[in-house]
Amino acid sequence: MKSFEKIKYKRLTILYFLFFIISSCKFNQSYFPHKEGKQIIYEVFFQDKENKKSNFRQSFYFFPRMENAIPVLKNDGELTFYVVQKNGIEKKSIDEFMSTGISNTKSEKNVDLLIAFPISTGTEWETNDKTTLQMKLGYDRIYNTNLPFKLTNKITEVNKTISIKGKKIKNCIKISSYGKTSYNPGPPLDNINIEVFSTSWFAKDYGLVKYKREEKSDSETMGKIIYEKTMLISD
């Protein structure tokens, strides 16, 4: 009788554990739009090192889900995949996605994670990134830096309320990120230090609702740039 009770207890424990995993998976997936044919539009603001400002829009079309992946088409023709894994939600290019397959897309490290699990304050991970600052020498020599660096990401809030054009979005995840690198172009210039700060807000059933990024250097040849994008929310 005692052995029967032990078996029953173990089965209940396993069922509870499976229920927890499934519930968590559904909870985590809700931070990205999953409706077939869903289109999302962002207003984008950019300020370059010369303090010139520009505004434009980006649109993203969500295709039907493929097992644990969501294909997304950007208005410039770029196709990417948001992949839900045990360790978080990854963003992959079509080449990365096709080389690993639909159900076997987990990275060896967290280099592609947009959101890491568990979704709780203090969760931290590193991703690969590149600088987008430009170096300007004189009037006609402009160089893209494209310097690789490690970006440290941390969930700082999980129930943040933000306002987008008067509409309150509750229970947002706030992710704060920081990275730094340096570059030595050679004489007569000294070593140039670059810092990158970014903040992302994700909301249930919306996905990324707001994003801010600032790259700054300690050299006038690079200066700093500011990039922001905000989702247009109609519903």
Which residues fall in each region the model found?
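Intrinsically disordered, low-complexity sequence elements enriched in Ser/Thr/Gly/Pro
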Residues: 6-9, 24, 222
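Bacterial N-terminal signal peptides that target proteins for export
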Residues: 2-14
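Conserved functional acidic sites
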Residues: 26-235
